């Protein structure tokens, strides 16, 4: 096998060009077999095999810097830089990351995970290179989906001032996770039909440069003049009108064409955009036919493409989806907004039922929130459904545009808490802190599926900014017998005891059930509280519990700083300083990839870790 010859960075340079096609086939076969066992991002990686091979052919690692936007499509890059044998532990605890990671290899220039930042990072690398007098190449690879994010345009605007080489590759597969939306998608679609442009332009440029004495001046004039040849053949060339050279489009599965164009791009004195057309899921029919299903997949059967582990109970996203549709039938003002993830956030059915009240704004979380503010001011009730780790990209808009105006915007914060295999960039461990600090914001977390439905109905009837956070995975089915109505700022007592009060938040309620059971088995009589409201605190309940308890234990899947436990602790310190508060939370760290239960134990949030900390506390030892 040709693939076996690649053991370290730049081994690809030893492979003859005629072997690149069979090598691409071997890599695809390896990716399909490997991801079918571990799960991972498949469709995007199958789409960039030839693109990555072509880049590695014209670049030298780690001297040259290759920055992947989002980074989930970097599997072939990892293989070509000597990490093939680590794919058995892809996205597992202590194993190979599903994203570029500088600590993993010097060939990974930038830790990635979120969208639309690669051009900014690349531009920083370019200026550092030039200031330090270095000569390496810097390449940012950004998908057409990521170009729906405004940060990419901020960077393109800034890059236009460059006078030195910077290569920006647009990996255009007409998809983000779901199908792309917006003006840039339409614009790139038009460019796909204009393949003759690049060849014609480069030919004209070379011919003009050969004109004695005035050739270079003619080229400069052509670039600056609005009536230049690009305007005749492709009116409104966005990139060139911004001051960036545009090359393409080129077939992203024709390696010789790409190598030729990439080498041409390396010679451009200034920023250059290379437009590459790829097909998500290429080489594996199930992924090609359904790229959204194979964006991020669990282990699957290669023959059928079916995921091996089927859900036995609905997930929280499913519960949210069904409840929102039901509410949408009753309330014609209810609208739903997603940032390029209608399937992941459970809005597909809402979009089908109420297409005029559904908005996919692209990978543009900041815009999504300010857009929701406008909808609210116009008399509608917007629901913004976004993953916790992505919502943090819009903190200023939530604070300034929604909370400051006290607008009725509902935030459905999906994937809150630990999410597992996607690691540091995707763990939703900060939302309670950044949402709770905002004036006028109300924050809730449900204990089970039914409570999520009730909280969503409460949020629709509420008048003000409100966020409901819920975790990834199966919705908790327990505690159905506890059905106290959701009342503003009120927690729920599941069990009344004495001395120890365990106060759990949302996703940690099942763990709190086990903690209380363990304490009872050890002879204690704990009170068990479902917090429900993280903000505002149920201070009346805290005051009541202070009468016959000496230890409060808060349990949350959020960073300790600014979280529920810290707010409880601050209140008790001010009003009941004799009572100790033990906070079980994520301490000051980024949580790596791994199985959620294993990660909880690793960071001190396991059931036994918390129970033991309670029983070891001074308050209990003194009793």
Q: What are the residue ranges of the model-derived segments?
A:
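Long, well-ordered, tryptophan-enriched scaffold segments
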Residues: 3, 174-320
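A glycine-rich helix N-cap at a beta->alpha junction
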Residues: 86-96, 161-175, 196-199, 403-415
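N-terminal amphipathic, basic-rich helices that act as targeting or association modules
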Residues: 1-80, 244-259, 275-278
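Glycine-/acidic-rich phosphate or pyrophosphate-binding loops and their flanking alpha/beta elements
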Residues: 260-263, 295-296, 305, 315-330, ...
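Non-catalytic terminal/interface segments that mediate subunit docking, oligomerization
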Residues: 65, 278-391, 397-407, 464, ...
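Cofactor-binding active-site loop characterized by glycine-rich and histidine/acidic residues
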Residues: 41-162, 316, 333-334, 338-339, ...
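Peripheral docking tails and interdomain loops at the edges
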Residues: 299-303, 307-312, 420-422, 442, ...
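Structural signature of the thiamine diphosphate
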Residues: 218-286, 408-413, 432-481, 607-623
